[in-house]
Amino acid sequence: ETGFDCAPIEFPTSGVADFREPAMQVMDINGMSACECYYKDYRISNGKPKLKGLPATYATDDEAQTLEVFCYDPHSGLYITLMYSVFPKFDVITRSVKVENNGLAAIDLRRIISMSLDLDRMDYDMITLHGTWARERHVQRFPIRFGKQSIDSNRGATSHAHNNFFALCDHTATEDFGEAYGFALVYSGSFLGMVEVGQYEKTRALLGINPYDFSWHLEPGEDFQAPEVIMTCLLYTSDAA
């Protein structure tokens, strides 16, 4: 098992031999959609910065710490900032992404997913909340399979049909026992939540803006801030209080 197609990747992009679902896809003036994300630097600060123009969690300097990972694509001139804020008292990490065009030409952002998480196995159940008008938030739980399983909305709002939340948990997990990962998008527009199991039995979870009909034009010097995802991981054992 070698190569991009089975490696755990923190922020997967298109056109780099990872054929699973990407977190970001662009289109330049020549029709090129490939994008390589290289690490450049990082910064750790107390507290949590505000997200421009978006609702988000908030914290004082003593309630959270934020890690910013600075990446870049040498071909397009895009700078990508991955932001992680840790809330120790709540076992919560929030994630968001900002993309800035530092190149010489305009570029279109065709896909920007706030969170991508690669897990080393596939024996999970997926839990989602579905419904309809006046009958929202019904729990659905099923074992994930090879391929893609997703929830989404493309109506411009999160909608009553699917909630912008999902969880992955052990097959035997309950409210009191087992391992579970939860993900919620702090955004009321169109969204996509997807879980993909690749050929090597590894799981990729993604949550963010729905790429359906999405395109954001970035002139040189402009940036785009993606909404925030709240993540939590719970591990309950028989000895847990």
Label for each model-derived stretch:
Residues 1-197, 202, 212-214:
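Polysaccharide-binding surfaces and accessory modules of carbohydrate-active proteins
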